Amino acid sequence: MKSTDPIKIAVLPGDGIGIEVTEATLPVFEVLDVPVILNYGDIGWEFWKKEGAAIPSRTWQLIASSDTVLLGAITSKPQREAKQELSNALKKSNPYYVSPVIQLRQGLDLFANVRPCFSIDDQSKPFNFCIIRENSEGLYCGFDYFPLPKAIHSLLAESQHWQTIPADEASCALRLQSKSGLTRLFDFAFKHAMQTGMPRVTLADKPNVLRESGEFTRKIFESTAQRYPKIQADILNVDAVALWLIKSPEKFGVIVAENMFGDILSDVGAGVMGGLGLAPSANIGDKGSYFEPVHGSGPRIRKNCANPSAMFLTISMLLNHFGYPDRAKKIVNAVMQVIKEKRFITYDLGGHATTTDMANAVIEHCARLNASCLSKDFNPTPKENLIESDTMPNLLQQLINCNSAEISDALDACGIEGGLLSIKPLSQGMKIIGPAYTIQYLPREKKGTAFHNAANYIDKVPKHSVIVIDNNGQIDCTVWGDLLTHTALRNNIMGTVVHGAVRDVESIRSTNYPVFCTGIYMCSGKNRVYKANEQCPLSINGVTINPGDIIFADDNGVLVIPNDRLQEVVNKTIAIRLTEERIKTAIASGSTLEQAREDYCYEQPWLGINKKRES
């Protein structure tokens, strides 16, 4: 596939919690703007019972036409139980059950199982290691016998111990390993270490017991290691590796092992991470791949209680594999942040959130982090014309085409009261976006007989600011008029918001200078009120405005966006705008309003999620 092509993903939700975590996490592709084509397929226990095939032929056809596979989870049972659950008609055909994951690994020749393990919650002793397990050979290669085949009887006859045991009372499994299979595995492990910056590759085996096959493996490992002189290579007994993974996981880099040893160590690694609910995996071959969380189908886990983190991290691995490392990292960071905050975590992490709750929290964090084109820090003194220039602060650029209704919904989603009640535009069609420069007026105890030049502050206001004046809502005297308007225009001030009255209305309107106010009155405030404070916090109708907070105003009214919450509000505003545009399009195409709202998650429009599945 070309780098610009969408990733064609065969999505196989599977069994049990696999269905739930898949459904809950897939919106992250859209939130992160990843070009994907998702096509759903059938796999798992239900299809074994109904059709006698855990992976139906139609699913293999789907996989063949896809770039990769995303698997939720599958239920797998021993051969006897598998056959017992078939219908009588299927029992007559005597199908042979093979776990779907084994079928995928062998059918697609996915020789490397990759299990990253890293510290998520506790950073006091950080670790980052990866277990790479051989998938196609070793003790899981499929040569597993009971009763023993006659070809093995002669081998038993050579052992004095086994001569005394009847052949029909023994079973065996062969640990078959090939030079080519081990060579490609070890080469993959060292390359992975180089790509991820891990300085050490450890072969976990049991050469002190499996002397012949262990020596065979050792020679191939050491030969491969010579091609990677910058990587430390060592061989340890697998039981020692398990011990030291628990005691000192930070000492390891890449751990490579044959099939069964790697399987066991992978679950040890998941435990070190914090549980199977956090453990992702990838299965990689020369020409294919599939990705799945480690946790399995979780038949004992209650509905909507499973931890979706492993699936999010699995999707992160998929994105990294297909050339989207930045977006992959955003998912990892979002998962870590949600777990750190502990507000929306599932029961296995000590919380009470549902699968959906935690997934939505991770997706929302991803939406915030996906502001790669947005500035990380906002400078309240922008450099160019706010509305017109392409060089205005990037965060504010995102709001140019938005309206106050959309931003108000975003503020509500953030739990922020931002609307300045009763303040309206002096002229229709005006819009303001910019940082607040605050002025506070207070009434004089006694009306003066002379003007006191209370508005000379305007000479110090930085260009592109929005002047916010609190005159306590008074409409019996004004604090803004013609002279201030012309000075503001000369100084490139973006607009004025007055909690009180203004005058010289005709002149102001003729200049197209944006003014928003409570009312209109002709009497000056110069001898009735005085400037008490400048660049101070204001409180207008219960809303606090701090210097540098963002003011957004249009025909609907005036909003205040706290500067420290700007990025969050921008992300949610854009998502809300996207959601409402989708709903409008759906209605224009014949959908009912109720259906369109359901399809596009209108109960949480700030996520910007398309909940419709593509058929």
Swiss-Prot record:
GO biological process: isocitrate metabolic process; tricarboxylic acid cycle
Keyword rRNA-binding among record annotations: no
Source organism superkingdom: Bacteria
GO-annotated molecular function: isocitrate dehydrogenase (NAD+) activity; magnesium ion binding; NAD binding
InterPro entries: IsoCit/isopropylmalate_DH_CS, IsoPropMal-DH-like_dom, RraA/RraA-like, RraA/RraA-like_sf
UniProt-listed CDD domains: RraA_family (cd16841)
Assigned keywords, A-Z: NADP, Oxidoreductase
PROSITE patterns named in the record: IDH_IMDH (PS00470)
Signal peptide span: none
Pfam families to which the protein is assigned, alphabetical: Iso_dh, RraA-like
Family: Belongs to the isocitrate and isopropylmalate dehydrogenases family.
UniProt xrefs under PANTHER family: DECARBOXYLATING DEHYDROGENASES-ISOCITRATE, ISOPROPYLMALATE, TARTRATE, ISOCITRATE DEHYDROGENASE [NAD] SUBUNIT ALPHA, MITOCHONDRIAL
Protein name as annotated: Protein DlpA
